[in-house]
A protein has these predicted regions:
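Transmembrane and membrane-interface helices of multi-pass
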Residues: 1-167
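Amphipathic, alpha-helical segments enriched in basic
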Residues: 7-17, 21, 28, 32-35, ...
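A diffuse structural propensity rather than consistent per-protein peaks
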Residues: 48-62, 80-83, 178-184, 262, ...
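Short coil/turn linker and secondary-structure boundary residues
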Residues: 63-69, 180-183, 485, 507, ...
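Membrane-interface segments at or immediately adjacent to transmembrane helices
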Residues: 132-209
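Solvent-exposed soluble domains appended to multi-pass membrane proteins
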Residues: 192-612
Length: 612
C-alpha cells in the first residue's frame, strides 16, 4: 500500500495546481504551467536538501525571518548538501521551456478552455486527494490527528499536500496564545506534579553553592567516547573526563531535539520543556515567559552568562536569553573574529575558549555559565595543519572529517579545563559536558555501517542518538550511570544537585538520580526508547536484542499515549505562553528589559588589560 501511495500522492496536487493555469489563455496558460511546475519542483528540491542534514522537512516556522537568517549564515553547509545531479529535479521544467522557446509547441494565443472543464479538472484534483487520504487512513488510521512525525505525512500524502497541512497547523498554533487563559496551565501542572521524582538524598545538595559550568559539545555523539580510529583514541581528554572518579557519566542519555537542533537542546536543558514539533521555539516563542535555569538560580545569588563564538542574532539568542534571565551574553562581538580563527559557523573552539578567560574572571561567584562550541559542526571542515588525527576512510567526506573536528574539540576542551584547574575554578565548580544532537544523520547509514561494524538500520540509528552527559562534582563519587534519560531531564537533575527542590516547578523531565525517575525517553516525533522496548519509525523493537516486536501490547500502547500526551502538554506551554499564568513560590519573574548584551567600550579595555 505504501509504495502505491508514494506513486500516486503527487498526482492530486499536480492536477489541481496545473489546472489553475487553464484559466489563462493559450500561450499564457502554458507559461503558467511552467511557473507552477517550477514552484512545485523547487519545494520538493528545497525539502530534499533540508532533509539531507536535518532528516526532517521544512515547516512554515522555518521560514520565520530570524530562522531564515540562520539558514543564510549556514552558507557553506547548504552548498555541501547540494549534489550536481540535483539538476535532474528540474529537467521537466527545462524541457517545457525549450518546447516553448524553440516553437515545438505553439499554443493558440486566443484559445481558452471552458470554465466548466477547468472546474472539472480542479474537482478531479480534490477528489484524487480525498481518495489518497482515504487509502492512507486505511493503512495508518488518524494520520492527520495523532502523528508527530512529518515523514508519515509526506510518505502518505506527498510533499505539496504536506506543506499545505503544515501551513494549516502553523496557523492554528498562532491562535493558541491569544485564546489561552490561566485555567489552561492547571492540566499541565497536574501532569508534571504527578510524575515528579523526589531527589535522591545521596546526591541532593552535594553541589550547593558551587559554580556551574556547561560545556556544550557540538554534534558530539556518545559513540565517540572511547572510540579508536586506526588504533588511536579520537577524544582522549573527554574520555579521561568520562572516567574521572568524580564524574557521573550517563551512558543511556539521548538527545531529544527536533527541527531546532541546538536551540531545542538549550530549550530542554534550561527549561525542561521540549522544542516545538514545527520550527524552533527560540525563533517563534523567544519572547515567552520562562522559568529557566539562570532565572531560578538568580534567586539563590547566582550570576549567569553564555559564551558563544557566533553573533547574538543567531537562533534569536539575544532575545531568548533575556527572557531566560541571563545576565551576560558574550557573543562574537566580544571576540577577535579574524579570518584565520573563523570557520564554518563562527569562532574556532581553541581561540574561543582562550579569549573567554577574561570574561569568566569578570563574573561574580557563584555563577552559572554555558560555553557553546562550534568547530565540530557539519560539514566538519578543518584545515590540515589543525587536524591532529587522520580522517576515517569510509569515502563519505562528512563522516571522515567528523573524527578530525571531534579531536580538535577534544583538544580545545582540554586546554579550557587546564585553565580552570590553574585558576582554582575547577575545584569549586560543577562541570557538565553534554552533546546537543547527532553529528551524523541517518542519510550516512552506509558510512556508519563501516564505522560501527554493524548494519546501521533504523534500530541502530535510534541507539546512535545517545549523546554524552557527564557531570563532574568535586567530592562526589562518580561512575557510570546506566539509567535511561534525555535532555529533558537535565534541569531537575542539576537543581537537585544544587539543593533546589523542583517540586513546584513546571518541568517535563525528572531527576536522573532519583529512585522515582521513570526511564522513558520520548523523541520529538512521538517515538520513544525505554530499557525494555522502543518505538522507532512506527515499529516496536525489543530494546535489548534489537529484534522487531510484531504485536503491540496494552502496555506499549499506554506508553505511546503517555509520550503523545507529554509532548502535547509541553507544546501547549510554549504555544499558549502558559507560564505567564503561573509563578512558583520563591521564584521572581524574569524582567527581560533589565538585560543589555551590547558590548561596551569598558569590556574591550578590561580584556586588553587582562591579556597583556
Amino acid at each position: 500500500m505504501q509504495q502505491f501511495l508514494l506513486i500516486i500522492n503527487p498526482l492530486s496536487t499536480a492536477v489541481f495546481f496545473m489546472g489553475l493555469a487553464l484559466f489563462a489563455k493559450g500561450r499564457r496558460s502554458f507559461i503558467w504551467i511552467i511557473v507552477i511546475d517550477f514552484l512545485l519542483t523547487f519545494v520538493l528540491f528545497a525539502n530534499m536538501v533540508y532533509y539531507r542534514f536535518f532528516s526532517d522537512f521544512i515547516t512554515l516556522p522555518n521560514l520565520n525571518p530570524k530562522q531564515m537568517q540562520n539558514m543564510g549564515d549556514m552558507g557553506g553547509s547548504i552548498l555541501a548538501l547540494i549534489h550536481w545531479t540535483d539538476i535532474l529535479f528540474f529537467a521537466d521544467v527545462l524541457i517545457l521551456i525549450a518546447l516553448l522557446v524553440f516553437g515545438i509547441i505553439r499554443p493558440n494565443k486566443e484559445s481558452r478552455i471552458r470554465a466548466r472543464k477547468v472546474v472539472g479538472v480542479l474537482t478531479l484534483g480534490v477528489a484524487m486527494f480525498f481518495a489518497n487520504l482515504g487509502l492512507a487512513e486505511i493503512d495508518r488510521p488518524q494520520l492527520l490527528t495523532r502523528t508527530f512525525d512529518r515523514n508519515y505525512i509526506v510518505k502518505y500524502l506527498g510533499m505539496t499536500n504536506y506543506q499545505i497541512y503544515d501551513a494549516v497547523k502553523s496557523t492554528e498554533s498562532q491562535t493558541q496564545k491569544a485564546l489561552a487563559d490561566s485555567s489552561d496551565v492547571n492540566e499541565v501542572l497536574n501532569y508534571t506534579k504527578s510524575k515528579y521524582a523526589a531527589p535522591n538524598p545521596e546526591y541532593f545538595g552535594k553541589a550547593k553553592g558551587k559554580n556551574v559550568i556547561y560545556i556544550h559539545l557540538e554534534s558530539f555523539q556518545q559513540f565517540l567516547i572511547n572510540y579508536k580510529l586506526n588504533g588511536e583514541e579520537v577524544t582522549p581528554f573527554i574520555n579521561s573526563f568520562f572516567k574521572d572518579q568524580n564524574t557521573l557519566a550517563f551512558t543511556n542519555f539521548f538527545h531529544q531535539t527536533g527541527q531546532g537542533k541546538t536551540a531545542d537542546a538549550e530549550m530542554m536543558l534550561e527549561n525542561s520543556l521540549y522544542g516545538l514539533s514545527q520550527g524552533s521555539a527560540f525563533t517563534t516563542k523567544g519572547s515567552n515567559t520562562f522559568q529557566s535555569a539562570p532565572g531560578i538560580l538568580a534567586n539563590y545569588g547566582y550570576d549567569s552568562a553564555v559564551f558563544h563564538g557566533n553573533y547574538k542574532s543567531f537562533w534569536n539568542r539575544d532575545e531568548v536569553y533575556k527572557h531566560f534571565g541571563y545576565n551576560h551574553f558574550f557573543d562574537a562581538s566580544y571576540y577577535d573574529m579574524n579570518d584565520n580563527d573563523v570557520s564554518n559557523y563562527g569562532l574556532k573552539d581553541k581561540p574561543f575558549f582562550k579569549e573567554s578567560e577574561p570574561y569568566i574572571e569578570s563574573l561574580k561567584q557563584p555563577f552559572y555559565a554555558k560555553f557553546i562550541t562550534l568547530t565540530n559542526h557539519f560539514p566538519y571542515p578543518i584545515d590540515s595543519d589543525e587536524a591532529s588525527i587522520a580522517p576515517a576512510t569510509t569515502g563519505d567526506s562528512s563522516v571522515d572529517t567528523y573524527f578530525q573536528t571531534a579531536r580538535y574539540l577534544d583538544e580545545s576542551v582540554k586546554s579550557f579545563v587546564t585553565y580552570l584547574k590553574e585558576t582554582g575554578l575547577y575545584d569549586n565548580s560543577v562541570i557538565v559536558m553534554y552533546g546537543d544532537h547527532y553529528g551524523i544523520s541517518d542519510n550516512h547509514a552506509s558510512a556508519m555501517t563501516k564505522i560501527l561494524g554493524k548494519d546501521y538500520n533504523a534500530y541502530e540509528n535510534a541507539q546512535a542518538q545517545r549523546v554524552p552527559f557527564m557531570v563532574h562534582v568535586p567530592g562526589v563519587k562518580g561512575g557510570v550511570k546506566t539509567q535511561y534519560g534525555g535532555e529533558i531531564d537535565v534541569l531537575p537533575t542539576m537543581l537537585h544537585l544544587l539543593g533546589i527542590d523542583t517540586k513546584n516547578y513546571l518541568q517535563m523531565g525528572t531527576d536522573l538520580l532519583s529512585k522515582d525517575h521513570k526511564q522513558l525517553v520520548p523523541f520529538r516525533n512521538g517515538d520513544f526508547i525505554s530499557p525494555t522496548y522502543s518505538l522507532i519509525g512506527g515499529k516496536y523493537y525489543n530494546q535489548t536484542t534489537g529484534e522487531p516486536v510484531e504485536k503491540e501490547t496494552k502496555e506499549m500502547e499506554a506508553t505511546k499515549d503517555t509520550v503523545s500526551k507529554e509532548l502535547q502538554l509541553s507544546d501547549s506551554v510554549l504555544q499558549g505562553d502558559l507560564l505567564r499564568f503561573y509563578t512558583p513560590e520563591g521564584f521572581k519573574k524574569v524582567d527581560p528589559s533589565k538585560y543589555n548584551y551590547n558590548k561596551k567600550k569598558s569590556d574591550s579595555e578590561d580584556t586588553t588589560e587582562t591579556t597583556k
